[in-house]
């Protein structure tokens, strides 16, 4: 399957673009933005040593600086030439990819919406308006936002509220309901709400189907959604809401053995890659990656990650697998 070829420590949140790694290096109370090779070599480092939030895409690097007065100065560099495109004093929140719709940054707080062009370094629109919830993602027409039990759909061009829906209406009496994730599928929204899943029309929010089955996360592959709930795995036909399992009680994944020890398959997310489901597990103080056959839910590969921390994320780039843990370490694997 894969073998580990590099470990980069203390990198925190990273961004991968064109075979390069971008992130923060903390050193003696200073924070630099760096561009690294896959071998961990520093190819470029910011002159600024007080970098706070940051983001990068194929064209630009953008970060802001933390000063005693606050977080204001924003710098935008051409990612390839490292020439400064923009430098200005403006308060922007940069840290989450959820804030970006291609090259447009949306800063939405309680009473204001500001849109900013990160390629040119200019404010496109600033409007005094209050939007409910937090941003999940953008579609071509909509801003999708949510809070604990509500989903809010705003029209992107004027920030008007198109519709909102209390998900509790579909699960009356379920006190543990909470929106965990929202996905866009065709012309619908799939909402993972802990105690169940609902599919709503993007146009007006009417209910298309509902599944009364616990759900934490979903990985969408074609018209199928692979759902995890902590120890179990099942899949759903997203066109009609029909649920399928693997013939096991409560859809529970089987325990697994490693070096003569038995472990619970305690995880909450699968990632689809090359026809298989990659499942991160933290059990008895150990972190593992289990590779699951989606047809049978049988294990195809069991790998122990060399860390005492919890594995947080698995991503695939070209022939590489990137794994991060709660200790801000990045493990790089190559396909064998």
Regions found by a protein language model. Give the residues of each.
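Structural motif
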Residues: 28-34, 69-76, 111-115, 148-153, ...
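Blade-level signature of beta-propeller repeat domains, shared across WD40, Kelch, NHL, RCC1
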Residues: 306-336
């Amino acid at each position: 399957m894969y073998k580990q070829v590099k470990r980069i420590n203390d990198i925190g949140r990273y961004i991968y673009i064109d075979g390069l790694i971008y992130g923060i290096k903390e050193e003696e109370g200073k924070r630099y933005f760096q561009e690294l090779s896959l071998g961990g070599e520093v190819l470029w480092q910011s002159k600024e040593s007080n970098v706070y939030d940051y983001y990068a895409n194929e064209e630009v690097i953008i970060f802001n600086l933390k000063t005693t007065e606050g977080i204001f100065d924003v710098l935008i560099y051409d990612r390839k030439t490292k020439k400064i495109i923009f430098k200005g004093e403006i308060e922007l929140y940069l840290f989450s990819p959820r804030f970006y719709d291609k090259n447009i940054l949306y800063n939405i707080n309680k009473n204001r919406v500001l849109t900013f062009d990160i390629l040119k370094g200019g404010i496109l629109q600033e409007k005094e308006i209050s939007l409910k919830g937090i941003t999940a993602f953008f579609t071509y027409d909509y801003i999708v936002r949510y809070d604990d039990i509500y989903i809010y759909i705003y029209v992107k061009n004027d920030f008007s509220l198109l519709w909102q829906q209390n998900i509790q209406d579909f699960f009356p009496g379920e006190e543990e309901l909470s929106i965990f994730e929202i996905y866009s599928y065709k012309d619908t929204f799939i909402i993972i709400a802990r105690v169940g899943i609902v599919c709503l029309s993007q146009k007006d929010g009417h209910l298309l189907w509902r599944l009364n089955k616990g759900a934490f996360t979903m990985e969408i592959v074609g018209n199928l959604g692979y759902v995890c709930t902590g120890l179990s795995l099942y899949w759903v036909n997203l066109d009609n809401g029909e649920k399928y399992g693997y013939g096991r009680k409560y859809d529970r994944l089987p325990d697994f053995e490693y070096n003569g020890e038995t472990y619970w398959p305690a995880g909450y997310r699968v990632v689809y890659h090359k026809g298989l489901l990659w499942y991160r597990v933290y059990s008895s103080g150990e972190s593992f990656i289990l590779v699951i056959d989606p047809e049978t839910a049988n294990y195809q590969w069991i790998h122990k990650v060399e860390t005492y921390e919890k594995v947080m994320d698995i991503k695939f780039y070209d022939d590489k697998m990137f794994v991060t843990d709660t200790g801000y370490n990045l493990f790089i694997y190559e396909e064998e």
